[in-house]
């Protein structure tokens, strides 16, 4: 509520059915009743490439994808007014039963790469990968510094990557975003509309 530019977009088209609030009127859940049409809004023309940081930021805000960005320290929703020192993306998790990102991104590697290029418009981009991902189609990434992390959990934790690669000093902030959101950002550039599938 402090930053009105951030939009939270529904993955389906329809009407808001209910808004569930918790303590201090915090929004816990918004229920949307589908109209069965799955209409999407064309935000930009397909193949759009933002030229400036402002264009890239405005596209992410209008699409609702900026709501997925987290700010460190404190792990809160990022503020678009702030200038981060860097953006971090961890492409793996060592937690038990964690999904394999290489499987998730299969066939969407080009979207992942163009999403990383979009992030590069915002700040320096650091991508953490596991040794198993070195010879996969997600590499090379020309727009990011790639670091390899191995070992047990929490090796895939983005906080570990921040601490090892570019620690946050007093007065600095960094943004983090999940790799599945980076794929959605690349898909947004390719199609010109948000696709949460």
Segments predicted by a language model, with ranges:
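Generic structural motif
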Residues: 3, 8-18
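Buried, small/hydrophobic-residue-enriched core segments of structured protein domains
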Residues: 6, 20-197
């Amino acid at each position: 509520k402090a930053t009105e530019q951030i939009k939270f977009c529904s993955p389906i088209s329809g009407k808001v059915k209910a808004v569930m609030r918790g303590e201090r009127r915090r929004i816990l859940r918004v229920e949307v009743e589908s109209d069965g049409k799955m209409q999407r809004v064309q935000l930009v023309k397909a193949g759009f490439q933002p030229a400036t940081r402002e264009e890239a930021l405005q596209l992410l805000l209008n699409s609702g994808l900026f709501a997925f960005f987290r700010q460190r320290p404190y792990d809160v929703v990022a503020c678009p007014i702030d200038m981060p020192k860097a953006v971090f993306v961890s492409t793996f998790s060592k937690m038990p039963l964690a999904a394999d990102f290489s499987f998730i991104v299969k066939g969407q590697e080009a979207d992942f790469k163009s999403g990383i290029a979009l992030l590069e418009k915002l700040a320096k981009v650091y991508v953490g990968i596991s040794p198993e991902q070195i010879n996969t189609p997600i590499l090379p990434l020309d727009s990011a510094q790639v670091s390899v992390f191995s070992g047990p959990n929490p090796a895939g934790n983005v906080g570990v990557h921040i601490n090892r690669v570019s620690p946050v000093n007093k007065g600095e902030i960094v943004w983090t975003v999940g790799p599945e959101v980076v794929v959605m950002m690349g898909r947004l550039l390719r199609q010109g509309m948000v696709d949460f599938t």
